[in-house]
Amino acid sequence: MSLQERVTDLESRLAFQDDTIQALNDVLVAQQRAVERLQLQMAALLKRQEEMVGQFESFEEEAPPPHY
């Protein structure tokens, strides 16, 4: 294999590696956005659950209805 062929081969590999790195970066960015969205949804669900628990606790604190 001549020096020129080796250089051409290395340049080709470098180009493929650059494409692969860019594709991996795109996937990573998309995953990070998805994680951030899920974190926001989880926080909203936790807040909603705490509100529901608070409503249930206040319901339990009410005096029981009179019985006949």
UniProtKB/Swiss-Prot annotation:
It holds the Pfam family SlyX. Transmembrane segments: none annotated. Signal peptide: none annotated. InterPro entries: SlyX. PANTHER family: PROTEIN SLYX. Belongs to the SlyX family. NCBIfam families: PRK00295.1. This is Protein SlyX homolog. It comes from Pseudomonas fluorescens (strain ATCC BAA-477 / NRRL B-23932 / Pf-5). The lineage of its organism: Bacteria, Pseudomonadati, Pseudomonadota, Gammaproteobacteria, Pseudomonadales. The gene is slyX.
